[in-house]
Amino acid sequence: MSKGHSLQDPYLNVLRKERIPVSIYLVNGIKLQGQVESFDQFVVLLKNTVSQMVYKHAISTVVPSRPVRVPMLNPESTGNDDMESGA
């Protein structure tokens, strides 16, 4: 399951750490706006005037208000997410 999170988690973490305002579009077309307060494997906590727990399976698109640079964890690794595991 970690392969699906190799880009998602660092991207959401940058949005959270830098408090970048985002628009989150849900699969039903609803647009939510706020800042990523926290996230885990299944949900994103979005904060505006209130905090909303948004299930990731309901999210279609995350649009930041400004460009986001996601640090590359291991640019040489093209298909192996088991970094330094020796496996």
Curated annotation (Swiss-Prot):
Q: This chain belongs to which protein, by name?
A: RNA-binding protein Hfq
Q: Which family does it belong to?
A: Belongs to the Hfq family.
- Highest taxon above the source species: Bacteria
Q: Which GO terms describe its biological process?
A: regulation of DNA-templated transcription; regulation of RNA stability; regulation of translation, ncRNA-mediated
**Keywords attached to this entry:** RNA-binding, Stress response
Q: GO cellular component annotations, sorted alphabetically?
A: cytosol
Show where the Sm domain sits.
Answer: 9-68
Query: What is the annotated signal peptide range for this record?
Result: none
Q: Name one GO molecular function term.
A: RNA binding
Species this chain originates from: Teredinibacter turnerae (strain ATCC 39867 / T7901)
HAMAP family membership: Hfq
- Intrachain S-S bonds: none
Q: What does this protein do?
A: RNA chaperone that binds small regulatory RNA (sRNAs) and mRNAs to facilitate mRNA translational regulation in response to envelope stress, environmental stress and changes in metabolite concentrations. Also binds with high specificity to tRNAs.
What would be one Pfam family of this protein? Hfq
This protein's assembly is summarised as: Homohexamer.
